[in-house]
């Protein structure tokens, strides 16, 4: 994935020098330090969308004059706009995110059935007090969750980078103390199928029409490209999900596979959690305006208080127990006894219309900010 360095300064910066430069350029100190901690001669400027290329300057004053027109504002289209993503568009967006907010770390945690990368976006705080995982688009026709999550992330990063933003100090605290892990598109093949059709993936429509119940419209497709529901793939009473469904074969929805963790996307997500043992997990789905927060009594006591805060800021209804098993959140709670929440965004029938986006985002952004408070 392409990244670009901007603003090359031909001298070493000590810590005091970094603070002075950040102040003169109007960049939050934490974002500036985290962006430049491994750089000695390339000055990386979070919160600026600069033209590509390496630009050489003689002084910080020259840098300040050059970058001034390129500072991002909360009202800018890239920050405040509404974007829809397939896997290719996601990759382009991640490249922009890395260029504009260099303190973000982007890596591949696995690959889909069709070898599409599954990306994780990370923050690496100086003082690691908490770890929080957020994910979206486990289900293919719930791709609007990716749009919501990335818009919120851009808002968080801009607030951390710009001291005049209303949530600057809150964002700085998150950046300094919380290791964020974000997987914006768990099911890239499925999203591509729903958004672009099988031909875009080099696949035959006839095969997928059979899996899709005879329909050539893929808007209701939830599964991965092999017809396995990724959110029924985890070893947390998986057998219940397997035996309760009449279909024992791949399908556009609900089929849990022949056994747990057969699918590369599910394996990647399980391995990520096993490596990092997050303190809190938030899985974004649609729809229902509900928050599922318990699993058979394995959830920690603090979950009850946390979900009350989520309800207060979002208006979403907390539901402790649900007749559902083998989901990522279910397994996470069962495996680690840590906080796990499935947040069902919006109301209606999947895929939700983008006409709902603004309403969904307003409620969800408040919940996500709250989720980063530990």
Task: Show the residue positions of the predicted features.
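Primarily a LysM-type cell-wall glycan-binding module
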Residues: 1-28, 48-67
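Stable alpha-helical elements in mature extracytoplasmic
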Residues: 17-21, 28, 86, 90-93, ...
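Short glycine- and acidic-rich boundary segments immediately preceding or forming the N-terminal edge
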Residues: 31-34, 55-118
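Short acidic beta-strand-loop surface patches of small beta-rich interaction domains
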Residues: 33-43
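Proline/glycine-enriched tight loop/beta-turn segments at coil->beta junctions
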Residues: 116-118, 125-131
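Active-site/substrate-binding loop(s) of hydrolase catalytic cores
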Residues: 144, 151-153, 157-292
């Amino acid at each position: 994935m392409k990244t670009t360095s901007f603003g090359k300064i031909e001298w070493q910066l000590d810590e005091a020098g970094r603070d002075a430069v950040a102040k003169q350029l109007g960049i939050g100190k934490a974002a500036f330090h985290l962006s430049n901690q491994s750089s000695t001669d390339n000055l990386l400027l979070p919160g600026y969308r600069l033209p590509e290329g390496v630009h050489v300057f003689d002084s910080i004053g020259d840098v300040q004059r050059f970058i001034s027109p390129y500072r991002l504002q909360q009202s800018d289209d890239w920050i405040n706009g509404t974007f829809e993503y397939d896997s290719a568009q996601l990759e382009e967006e991640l490249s922009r995110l890395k260029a504009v907010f260099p303190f973000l770390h982007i890596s591949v945690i696995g690959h889909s059935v069709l070898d599409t990368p599954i990306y994780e976006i990370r923050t690496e705080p100086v003082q690691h007090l908490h770890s929080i995982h957020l994910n979206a688009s486990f289900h293919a026709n719930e791709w609007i969750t990716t749009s919501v999550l990335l818009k919120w992330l851009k808002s968080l990063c801009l607030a951390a980078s710009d001291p005049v933003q209303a949530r600057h100090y809150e964002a700085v605290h998150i950046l300094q103390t919380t290791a964020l892990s974000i997987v914006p598109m768990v099911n890239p093949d499925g999203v591509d199928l729903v958004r672009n059709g099988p031909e875009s993936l080099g696949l035959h429509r006839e095969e997928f029409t059979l899996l899709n119940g005879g329909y050539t419209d893929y808007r209701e497709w939830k599964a991965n490209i092999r017809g396995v529901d990724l959110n029924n793939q985890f070893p947390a009473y998986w057998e219940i999900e397997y035996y309760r469904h009449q279909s024992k074969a791949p399908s556009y929805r609900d089929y849990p596979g022949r056994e747990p963790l057969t699918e590369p996307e599910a394996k990647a997500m399980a391995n990520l959690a096993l490596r990092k043992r997050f303190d809190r997990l938030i899985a974004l789905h649609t729809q229902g305006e509900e928050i599922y927060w318990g699993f058979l009594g394995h959830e920690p006591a603090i979950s009850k208080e946390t979900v009350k805060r989520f309800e207060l800021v979002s208006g979403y209804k907390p539901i402790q127990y649900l007749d559902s098993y083998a989901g990522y959140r279910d397994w996470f709670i069962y495996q680690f006894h840590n906080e796990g929440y499935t947040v069902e965004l919006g109301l209606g029938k999947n895929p939700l219309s983008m006409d709902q986006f603004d309403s969904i985002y307003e409620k969800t952004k408040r919940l996500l900010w709250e989720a980063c408070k530990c």
